[in-house]
Each structure stands twice: as C-alpha cells, then as structure tokens.
C-alpha cells in the first residue's frame, strides 16, 4: 500500500521559499492588481458553500481542478518538473491565504481590544511603566495593542530584572537599555535573594557597558542603580560606567568584593549622589583619612549611607558623621570594630544634627555603657530629629569586665515619656533567654511535636534596615514596642509586651 502522503522527489534545487516572501512569486507580463483582487474576492465569496464531502463542496472542487490540471501538463518535455512546480505554487498560495487570514484576525482583535479596553493608551503606558520588566514582557505578549503600548520608552524608565535573574544575560540588558533610551531612570540587576549561587548569573563584567554608549547618553539620564550579588563586578568595571552616570543619586551594591579604600573611586564622578548602600562579602581594609576626605568631597549631598560589613572604627565613624552635614540615615550593621565611643564626640553637633535613623545591628564589640550614654544624650535634648535607633545583636552587648549581656539596663520608661516619637529597638536573641522564657517550649515539643509555635517580636526586619523615612505612625507606636522588645528578649512577658503569638498546626 502506498504511503498516504508520498514524498515527491525534488528534481531541481529551489532557492528561498516564496512562502515567506510573497514578492518572490513570478509576475505575469499582463499582471493587473485589480483583476487579481477581484478574482480573490470572488473566490472568497464562495464561503457559503459546504467545505467538505458534498459534490458541490469547495474541497471537491479543489480536487477536480487539480486532477484536471495535472494530466494537462503531462506530455510536455519537462512534465515532472512542471507538475512539481505547479503543486509547490499551489501550496505557496494556500500558505499566503492562511497567513493573510491570521493577520486579519489579529487586526480585528486589536480593534476590538482598543474599543473595549477602558484606559487610554497614555494611561495604559503609565500603568505598564509601573510593572517590573518581567511582568511587562508578559503583558506585551497578550495582544498587539498591549505590545504597542509596551514598546513605548516610558515603560522602560524603571528596569527591574531581579525577578528573572537566572534568565538575564548581557543581551537582555542591552536591549532593555536601548528601548529605554533617554527615559531610563532606574536599573536593577542581579538576584535579591542572598541564597542565589553566583554561578547562576549569566551577566558578565561588561553587562553595564551599554550605559556608556554614545558618549554616555543613556547613562546620563540614570538616577538609580541597584546591583545585587554580581560577584564578577568590581571597581575596575564599575568606574567607567559610573563616570557616564553623572546624574546618579541612588547607588546600591549588595555583595561587593572590594576594599574600603575604593569608596572614593566609586563616587568620584557621582557628585549628586544622595543615597549610598554598599554591602561587602568579606572583610575590607580600614579606610584612611585621605580616602575619607575624598569620599566626603565627592558626595556633598549625601543624606543616607549604609556600609554593611565594613571594618569601620569609632574614629572613622565620628569623622564620617561630622563630614556629612546632611546625613539623615546611617546603617553600619555588622561592623566588628565599632564599640560606640564615637557617641562621645558628637556632643557639639548633637543638638542640630539632622540624623533621623541610626542602625548598628550585630556590631560585635558595641558596648552597653556607650549606648546608655547616647540614650542619656537623647533625654538631654540632643539629636532632636532622630526617630529610629537599632542596636540589636545576636551576641548581646559588651558590659563591664568584657562580659556580654542580653539584659542591658536602658532608661526605656524615661525615653518613652520624654521622647515618645523615638523608636528604640534592642533585640538580643540567645538560647539562654529563649530557654528562660515563660513559654513551655520543651514540654510543647514533647507533647505536640507536629505543632509549630511562632513568637514574633515587632522590630524592623534586616531587609528593612536601610530605612529612609519612617512613617510618623510607626514612630508613635515605637515606644511601647521597643520597651517590649528589650523586656521580651530577657525572658519577661506581660500583657502590654506587644508580643504576637501565632500557632499553626502542620
């Protein structure tokens, strides 16, 4: 039995198929476009006839015509070639008709969407500009109307590729930056999750090079640059990029493998920078006075600084606070060299200091006595703009004799009365304080092993440690929550502790 669709031999090699290029079809000498249009229109008007099975169906008409035409070609000198060419042309015409029909369907759908979609194109573009880049690409694939709106440069003003970090390579970044053009305002690259392996990133050292194209035209419009866990990027690759971003005001680098001495180099060309956040992987060297002076001179408008994991000592920190007169937010968490002695040198500038947020989480040698001295200065009226202080430490604070305490003696009640708008967070997590709590955890584990007990003490999470503008409502509730935080960590519980208890049964 013959195969249902036997493969015809290709006697003459053919070039590029004219299916993809309709203009490649041969044109008759007496070609008349209007006659062709009329013929096709007459052909398509037969759609009311049955399509298959019946003798008067269009399908049977096709079969009869082909059966009659093919024998008429037989007997010529090149009958096999002419038959193959005729059949190929028939398939090409059928394909062209199919593609034209699909285009017509899409045009009708676009017209219907434009009439039924409640938002104007300008508002749709505005909504799309608020989406992260991955969601924007998904929306653009829905229909032609959305695709046209998603191609507007405004939609790429804020490029966020952190939600699809594993699929982003240099080419994707280049295309996104090119689409944004002069509308580019912010760019986020990398994986926000710290658990992501650095090998999963497809980006290289040159991923930010498109910002320097055309003499830095696109980079000159950039205002915010956030890079997360891109180990291959260092100061050597960042410096030429930042030199093109002259209007940058917000720089955030999480996971920088770089010594502290390069701070001045990073900010040398970004004199408008206001918010600086840098977290390093390993220990960095101590910053020198010359580097600090260069850093301060490069960033006269700096109002928020977060240096996580740096080897900053108290002397450098004191100069840092005094050197930046506009500093409102300071986050120096995980700095192993800060003891708190810098508080003593801030008495002269304390009253008029614009400082609003001070975060010293997990500073290993931070002393209880120095924190107490700072709190007393608050009671005396210094730092009148401060709203948030965080000295939480998983290892506790250093007390007299070099020991560590998880129950520091802080004037919480006085602070609540005199500075009720200040949020003071002091959470010290330790196994001893947990075991000494009044919760029967051991008995609960024995009696109900499938039960999960969660006791959450209200405090800013580590991911929110880079606070810029704490709301007044949160500040007003801080006095009770901060008092409860310190008391709860020492194993004391009360009805006013502000502790949230939640039980979830697996």
UniProtKB/Swiss-Prot annotation:
Ranges of Acidic residues composition bias in the record: 493-506
Start and end residues of each F-box domain: 115-161
Gene3D superfamilies: Ribonuclease Inhibitor
Low complexity bias (residue ranges): 459-492
Coiled coil residues, start to end: none
Sequence segments annotated as region (Disordered): 452-506
Protein name according to UniProt: F-box protein At4g02760
Organism (species): Arabidopsis thaliana (Mouse-ear cress)
């Amino acid at each position: 039995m013959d195969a249902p669709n036997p493969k015809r031999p290709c006697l003459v090699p053919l070039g590029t198929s004219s299916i993809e290029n309709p203009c490649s079809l041969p044109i008759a000498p007496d070609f008349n476009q209007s006659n062709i249009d009329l013929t096709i229109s007459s052909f398509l008007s037969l759609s009311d006839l049955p399509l298959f099975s019946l003798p008067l169906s269009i399908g049977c008409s096709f079969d009869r015509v082909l059966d009659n035409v093919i024998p008429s070609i037989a007997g010529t000198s090149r009958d096999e070639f002419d038959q193959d060419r005729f059949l190929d042309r028939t398939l090409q015409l059928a394909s062209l008709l199919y593609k034209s029909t699909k285009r017509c369907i899409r045009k009708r759908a676009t017209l219907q969407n434009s009439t039924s979609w409640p938002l104007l194109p300008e508002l749709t573009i505005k909504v799309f500009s608020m989406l992260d880049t991955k969601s924007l690409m998904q929306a653009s694939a829905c229909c032609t109307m959305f695709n046209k709106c998603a191609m507007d440069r405004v939609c790429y003003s804020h490029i966020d590729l952190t939600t699809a970090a594993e699929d982003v390579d240099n080419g994707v970044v280049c295309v996104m930056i090119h689409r944004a053009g002069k509308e580019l305002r912010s760019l986020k690259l990398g994986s926000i999750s710290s658990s992501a392996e650095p090998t999963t990133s497809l980006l290289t050292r040159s991923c930010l090079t498109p910002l320097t194209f055309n003499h830095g035209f696109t980079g000159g419009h950039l205002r915010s640059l956030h890079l997360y866990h891109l180990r291959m990027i260092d100061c050597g690759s960042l410096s030429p990029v930042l030199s093109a971003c002259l209007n940058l005001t917000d720089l955030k680098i999480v996971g920088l493998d770089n010594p502290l001495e390069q701070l001045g180099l990073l900010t040398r060309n970004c004199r408008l920078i206001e918010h600086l956040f840098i977290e390093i992987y390993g220990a960095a060297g101590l910053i020198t006075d010359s580097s600090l002076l260069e850093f301060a001179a490069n960033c006269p408008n700096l109002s928020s600084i977060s240096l996580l994991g740096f080897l900053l000592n108290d002397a450098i920190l004191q100069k840092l606070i005094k050197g930046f007169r506009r500093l409102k937010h300071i986050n120096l968490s995980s700095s192993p060299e800060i003891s708190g002695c810098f508080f003593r040198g801030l008495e002269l500038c304390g009253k008029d200091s614009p400082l609003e947020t001070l975060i010293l989480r997990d500073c290993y040698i931070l002393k209880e006595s120095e924190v107490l001295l700072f709190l007393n200065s608050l009671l005396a009226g210094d730092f009148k703009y401060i709203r948030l202080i965080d000295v939480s430490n998983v290892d506790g604070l250093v007390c007299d004799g070099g020991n560590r305490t998880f129950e520091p003696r802080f004037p919480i009640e006085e602070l609540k009365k005199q500075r009720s708008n200040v949020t003071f967070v002091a959470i010290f997590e330790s196994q001893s304080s947990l075991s000494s709590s009044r919760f029967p955890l051991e008995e609960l584990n024995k009696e109900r092993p499938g039960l999960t007990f969660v006791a959450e003490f209200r405090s800013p999470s580590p991911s929110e440690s880079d606070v810029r503008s704490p709301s007044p409502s949160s500040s007003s509730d801080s006095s009770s929550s901060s008092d409860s935080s310190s008391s709860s960590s020492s194993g004391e519980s009360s009805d006013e502790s502000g502790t949230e208890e939640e039980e979830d049964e697996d």
